[in-house]
Design a protein with these regions (language model features):
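Acceptor/aglycone-binding surface of glycosyltransferases and processive sugar-polymer synthases
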Residues: 75-91, 96, 108-187, 218-223
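Hydrophobic helical membrane-anchoring modules
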Residues: 1-7, 185-248
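Short beta-strand/loop segment that forms part of the nucleotide-sugar
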Residues: 36-46, 72-74
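Hydrophobic targeting segments
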Residues: 5-11, 27, 38-43, 233
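A conserved acidic beta->alpha catalytic loop
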Residues: 44-55, 104
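Short, well-formed alpha-helical segments that are part of the catalytic scaffolds
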Residues: 16-31
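Donor nucleotide-sugar binding loop of glycosyltransferases
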Residues: 16-19, 47, 80, 104
Length: 248
């Protein structure tokens, strides 16, 4: 039975057509056979002209499998959070808003699982993926990434008070009504936008379910743990200041 809830799924992309080219067909096929009402938006984050052209060709090809896909091009770089929020902002008819990374680290089956879970929940509930290494949900990543992940999680809990197992996993599903109420107060667009989003959702009274999913490191990722660490910490401090000021 098809879901009655209208879902918007955004895949942010920045100079990443090759990895989306590997993951996109899998996700398109999964969405086509899901029975869910999903508007899939590939949101480009100011990629090069060649990348934009490659994305256009790719989306045209994927449309043959899943017609409800579209490409949104941003002329300037707006960062990952900006690419997601710009797409969400134009979808006022949606009941559920979601995003999934373009690299394929999260498989299509997990995407459908989270979307289906959200459809069955209370309208003011959300769902996020969690990377937790078990037999059922194997996680494959270098030890350096595992260490930086644990350190960042501790910082988030101590600085922000957001007590989730994994704030940075590349799939989140949120209630559209709650997002549109708080959207103007969301300032972060870089790698810590997820933390601010989750904090604001909690402040809105939303219940967030954490679902463990399989995950594997895909080469050519955009996050550089050592180089990006200071910027991410600065972002957490900005979020903390806004939270103390009652912005959320």
């Amino acid at each position: 039975m098809a879901s009655e809830k209208q879902i918007v799924l955004v895949t942010p992309v920045w100079n990443d057509s090759i990895r989306l080219g590997r993951f996109g067909p899998e996700l398109a096929q999964a969405l086509a056979s899901s029975g869910l009402s999903v508007r899939w938006i590939v949101s480009d984050d100011g990629s090069s002209a060649l990348e934009k052209a490659a994305l256009g060709t790719l989306v045209d090809r994927l449309r043959g499998v899943y017609p409800q896909i579209e490409l949104q091009l941003n002329q300037e770089r707006v960062r990952k959070g900006g690419a997601i929020y710009r797409a969400w902002d134009m979808c006022t008819e949606a009941d559920i808003l979601a995003f999934v990374d373009a690299d394929g680290a999260i498989d299509a089956a997990s995407v459908l699982r989270l979307l289906s879970h959200a459809c069955a929940q209370d309208p003011m509930s959300g769902v996020i993926g969690v990377r937790h290494n078990t037999v059922a949900t194997p996680v494959q990543r270098p030890w350096q990434r595992a260490v930086s992940f644990r350190v960042f999680t501790i910082l988030v809990r101590r600085l922000i008070g957001v007590d989730f197992e994994d704030t940075q996993c590349g799939i989140k599903v949120v209630p559209a009504a709650a997002y549109h109420v708080m959207a103007a107060n969301l300032m972060e667009r870089g790698f810590v936008f997820d933390v601010e989003l989750l904090l604001a959702l909690q402040q809105q009274g939303c219940q967030i379910t954490e679902l463990r999913i399989p995950w594997r490191e895909i080469p050519e990722g955009k996050v550089r743990p050592l180089l990006d660490a200071w910027g991410m910490i600065a972002g957490l401090l900005r979020i903390r200041q806004r939270a103390k000021a009652g912005q959320y």
